[in-house]
Amino acid sequence: MISTGLEKLDELLGDGIKNGIITDIFGASSTGKTQLVLQIAVNSLSLGGTILYQDTTGNFRPERLLDMLKPKELDAALLDKITVGRITNMQEQFSAISKIEQSNYSLVIIDNITDLFSFEYSKEEQILEKNKQFTKYMKQLASVVFEKKIPVVAVNMIRKINDIEQENLDSVMSLFTHIKIKLSKKSTNYMGEVFPHSGENRFYYKIEKNGLTSST
């Protein structure tokens, strides 16, 4: 188990991020998605873990990890245990699955998992092909995750469809992800929800320089 750094979220997840499943973190822009996965990465590093960070957006910033390491008094040399793979097209994202299969990482982060598929299949008439290719990708990824018993955390975005907010490629994501964490902001308050979950599934948080902290 890897702690998320948020006590209530860990409780809702049954102690943290589990092995052998894909955990889906999604939400609108500026709700703390990337900060949460970086926080999970730092907690994995503190346990001696090695991490594969697949960056499809070019937004990975090691200095943000340093900001999180310092309060925990962890050595900056731990960053050497993170392998960052910059992925610039859909084919590279498919090929990157083999890196997971051939290695023994303690944690894999994919940020953002759907972005390149939406970019390369951006036209209305390409929707079916986009869903077909993304389904193929997720099926291959899920198979490796199950076989290797590796925890994978995927970041995804929200899009507006007919003025309704919906997770990007939700119909496919829901087939292959086991836990969903939705992050949202209302006014100045941040809230997360965990699915599926019976009973109360919400947690509240603040975004700070050194990561996400619990809020009431």
Positions of predicted regions on the chain:
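Short, surface-exposed amphipathic charged segments that create phosphate/polyanion-binding patches used
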Residues: 93-103, 194-199
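Pre-Walker A adenine-sensing motif
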Residues: 4-16
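Conserved P-loop
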Residues: 18-95, 99
